[in-house]
């Protein structure tokens, strides 16, 4: 039951002590920019709606701008249904059933393989698990619910230091199949990028909007910040 779980994971006796409760991340409001058809956009100075042909994204990976700055409860499921269906319909319209599958170029394949090999064979001494935990604690402490300039800057400085440590991580498992160590290392690279985008964006946005609450800038500023942050 609950008492056994709390005892096992927190080392607490709930008949004598309260259960510790802290906020945690359960949704990412942001991601790859998309249109309402789930097509990925590559905005530029001349066309903010330019489509990246053949590439789609839905769910938390995507940012179709339907939630604003604070998603309401249960809307994530509705988002998946709506945009998942929209993506399928659009894919059916743009795919030529008579066209054969185009294979990626060898140069593109080589780049991916080289990246995997460089991470797997890196001669570092930094533990992936320890660096990930360090990053998680920094994000929890510096980029939490209530934010202000000093803690955001500290968090970004700490992440910048960790990004240097990322160059020295060690993957113990050297196998080519079912290599969870390598998967965790790749995940850490992605997590560091996401954490960096959150921290830099939060520090730059000198206002409060939706789930972004700045104690030093408590008011919404539509004149300067009614826009997305592109990272």
Located regions from the model:
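FAD/FMN-dependent oxidoreductases across multiple families
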Residues: 8-53
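Long, contiguous hydrophobic alpha-helical segments, chiefly transmembrane helices and signal peptides
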Residues: 2, 19-21, 32-34, 61, ...
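Glycine- and aromatic-enriched mobile tails/lids
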Residues: 27, 39-57, 61-231
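An anion/pyrophosphate-binding glycine-rich loop and adjacent beta-alpha core
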Residues: 1-25, 90-96, 132, 137
């Amino acid at each position: 039951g609950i008492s056994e779980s709390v005892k096992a994971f927190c080392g607490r006796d709930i008949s004598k002590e309260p259960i510790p409760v802290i906020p945690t991340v359960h949704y990412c409001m942001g991601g790859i920019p998309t249109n309402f058809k789930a097509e990925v956009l590559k905005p530029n100075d001349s066309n903010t709606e330019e489509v990246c042909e053949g590439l789609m994204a839905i769910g938390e990976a995507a940012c179709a701008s339907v939630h604003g700055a604070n998603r309401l409860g249960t809307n994530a499921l509705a988002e998946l249904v709506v945009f998942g269906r929209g993506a399928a319909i659009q894919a059916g319209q743009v795919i030529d059933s008579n066209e054969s599958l185009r294979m990626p170029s060898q140069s593109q394949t080589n780049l991916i393989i080289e990246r995997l090999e460089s991470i797997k064979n890196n001669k570092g001494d930094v533990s992936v698990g320890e660096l990930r935990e360090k990053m998680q604690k920094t994000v929890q402490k510096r980029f939490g619910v209530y934010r202000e300039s000093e803690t955001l800057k500290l968090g970004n400085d700490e992440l910048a230091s960790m990004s240097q440590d990322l160059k020295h991580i060690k993957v113990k498992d050297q196998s080519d199949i079912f290599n969870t160590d390598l998967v965790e290392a790749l995940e850490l690279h992605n997590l560091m990028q996401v954490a960096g985008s959150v921290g830099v964006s939060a520090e730059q946005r000198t206002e409060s909007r939706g789930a972004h609450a700045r104690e030093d800038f408590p008011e919404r500023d539509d004149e300067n910040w009614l826009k997305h942050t592109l990272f």
